[in-house]
């Protein structure tokens, strides 16, 4: 549930920032291409935005790794990362509301805050070895290859099936989890994009709210329940 909420946050932020400033702050693979195209065209404005997004994302990921390392034993401390991300998203929204219309420097500030938040979120998903929540290339690859493995293993198990014999299904998470993550990412990007076109920066309440819901879920389990070092459900 929590990873799916984070996927909603990732898709929403990228859609809103892309519509607003023509740059990606979560999906850095695509943003790297935007940077390359801007450099090839000699587009200083687009290149500056994309480069800042990359750097801020990297800083956010590094900060996330530091915060996660403060946990004890094999239990990463999730709440500091989630709280920091929520504060960045809400701070970005408050800043945007308070100073609009944004000049160029203020736009760069919004881009940096969004990329910092998405870097934190990416570090969290990476540490927990779950589906990615800020970019979908790996998630789609995992879904496709996992589906093939799941089907092949199931067919072999059915051919050898006998009473009392294990089913032979793959031990890893079922591929539908990655598929659903992608669908939620897509749906949230569509929804937040539509909201942004009608309500401008207020659309960012969607990703901020999703992260706040994850925080509430984590508070119910003490930040990270035993055995959750590799999962965030």
Locations of regions flagged by a protein language model:
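Alpha-helical transmembrane segments of multi-pass membrane proteins
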Residues: 1-233
């Amino acid at each position: 549930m929590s990873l799916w909420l984070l996927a909603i946050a990732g898709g929403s932020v990228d859609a809103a920032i892309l519509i607003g400033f023509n740059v990606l702050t979560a999906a850095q693979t695509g943003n790297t291409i935007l940077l390359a195209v801007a450099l090839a065209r000699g587009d200083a404005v687009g290149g500056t935005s994309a480069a800042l997004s990359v750097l801020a994302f990297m800083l956010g990921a590094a900060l996330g790794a530091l915060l996660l390392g403060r946990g004890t034993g094999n239990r990463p401390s999730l709440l500091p990362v989630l709280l920091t991300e929520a504060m960045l998203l809400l701070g970005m929204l408050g800043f945007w509301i308070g100073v609009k219309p944004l000049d160029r420097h203020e736009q760069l500030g919004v881009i940096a805050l969004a990329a910092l938040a998405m870097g934190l979120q990416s570090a969290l998903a990476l540490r927990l070895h779950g589906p990615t929540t800020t970019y979908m290339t790996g998630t789609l690859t995992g879904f496709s290859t996992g589906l093939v493995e799941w089907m092949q293993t199931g067919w072999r198990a059915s051919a050898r099936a006998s009473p009392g014999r294990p089913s032979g299904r793959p031990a890893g998470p079922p591929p539908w989890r990655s598929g659903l993550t992608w669908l939620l990412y897509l749906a949230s990007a569509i929804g937040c994009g539509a909201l942004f076109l009608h309500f401008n920066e207020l659309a960012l309440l969607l990703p901020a709210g999703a992260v706040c819901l994850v925080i509430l879920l984590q508070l119910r389990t003490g930040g990270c329940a035993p055995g959750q070092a590799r999962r965030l459900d």
